[in-house]
């Protein structure tokens, strides 16, 4: 039992760290008015196992430290709202595509308002919202398509993703 909990915690830490690393590696396009936050692709993991929600939320919170307390609070809130929708949507590629516009609207509104009012970005409020929404839509849709491709070409990868913390037996080569 303890080994399984350690394995789960380790996987969660790796996902949170990957989210942060992707944001920082692509910081030039992960923050600001025009955002293509590649790390948002990790939202799709939560379709396969709801336990990944905590890792994505933690990763978002840590990554948003770069932008200060408002982004830590509001950016993380936007992620929580998107993940609540994910939890309501059942599996299936067509249903997963719904998350792209939902994430775009939520992030467009929340982050757009934050950029306009708190960070005082001089563009019009609607421009702030639309710019953020376009990037979010593109990245999340890309994530849905990537994972749909993985499901078709290598479903065992998806089985591993679904079975976080499970005792997965790997085939051993017998010589």
Language-model features, listed with the residues they occupy:
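Hydrophobic, membrane-inserted alpha-helices
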Residues: 39-42, 55-63, 81-85
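Hydrophobic transmembrane alpha-helices
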Residues: 1-54
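Interfacial segments of multi-pass membrane proteins
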Residues: 47-49, 61-67
């Amino acid at each position: 039992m303890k080994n399984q909990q350690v394995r789960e915690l380790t996987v969660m830490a790796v996902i949170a760290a990957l989210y942060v690393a992707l944001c920082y590696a692509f910081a030039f396009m992960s923050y600001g008015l025009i955002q293509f936050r590649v790390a948002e692709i990790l939202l799709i993991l939560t379709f396969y196992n709801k336990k990944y929600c905590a890792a994505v939320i933690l990763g978002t919170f840590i990554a948003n430290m770069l932008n200060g307390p408002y982004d830590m609070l509001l950016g993380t809130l936007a992620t929580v709202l998107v993940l609540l929708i994910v939890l309501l949507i059942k599996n299936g590629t067509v249903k997963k595509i719904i998350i792209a516009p939902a994430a775009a609207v939520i992030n467009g509104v929340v982050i757009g308002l934050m950029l306009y009012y708190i960070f005082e970005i001089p563009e019009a409020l609607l421009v702030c919202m639309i710019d953020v929404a376009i990037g979010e839509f593109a990245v999340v849709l890309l994530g849905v398509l990537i994972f749909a491709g993985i499901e078709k070409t290598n479903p065992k990868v998806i089985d591993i993703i679904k079975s976080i913390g499970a005792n997965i037996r790997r085939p051993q080569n017998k010589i």
